[in-house]
Amino acid sequence: MKDVRELLKVNEEKLPRIYCDMDQVLCALLRTANQITGQDFSKMNKDTRWKIISNVKGFWENLPWMPGAKRLYQRIAKYDPYILSAYPEKDVNARGGKVKWVLNNTRIPKSRILVVKRAEKQRYATHNGEFSVLIDDYIKNIKEWENKGGVGIHHTDVSRTLKELSNLGYK
């Protein structure tokens, strides 16, 4: 991770925009999908796994929170974060369901919920010439984000992410 304190003399009144991923950061996609399919979802054939999930009514909007994720959300909520989540193209319910999840579980307005193709996430790395921060569990997204001038926090657990946010000035 870039040392943001060097890039920006952190002004706590004007911190960079935060984008937060959903799946495996805020909501427990894999645990729920593993329970529904009865197998390791990540190792299943993509067509097969998304066909199963797309047939589960309310799958996306009913995902449970990840352990500790409410603490993370409470920290970032005061900085008017955006949700930046990728949708699987093979599940027609994913985009709408993800938006419903955010609206039902957070106070983030619809105008700050971005559900895009995975490769499009990097387009948000900067805003008005300034870098933005991405919290994401997928290292490829973090690397692409940083290559486009943003600062990435590779989310592996809540405590680590909260520490990195503190180091960036998000208290």
What are these model-derived regions, one by one?
Residues 1-16, 27, 65, 71, ...:
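Charge-dense, intrinsically disordered terminal/linker segments
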Residues 3-58, 147, 157:
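Active-site neighborhood of HAD-like aspartate-dependent phosphohydrolases
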Residues 17, 113-145:
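Conserved Lys-Pro-Asp/Glu-containing loop-to-beta segment of HAD-superfamily phosphomonoesterases
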Residues 26-30, 35, 81, 90-94, ...:
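Short catalytic/ligand-binding loop motif for oxyanion handling, primarily in non-cytosolic enzymes
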Residues 44, 54-83, 91-96:
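Short, acidic loop-to-helix structural element flanking the phosphoryl-transfer center
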Residues 82-95, 99, 103-123:
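A short, structured active-site edge motif that brings together acidic residues
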Residues 123-128, 164-171:
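Short amphipathic alpha-helix with an adjacent loop that forms part of the alpha/beta core around
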Residues 132-167:
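Acidic, Mg2+-coordinating phosphoryl-transfer loop and its flanking beta/alpha structural elements
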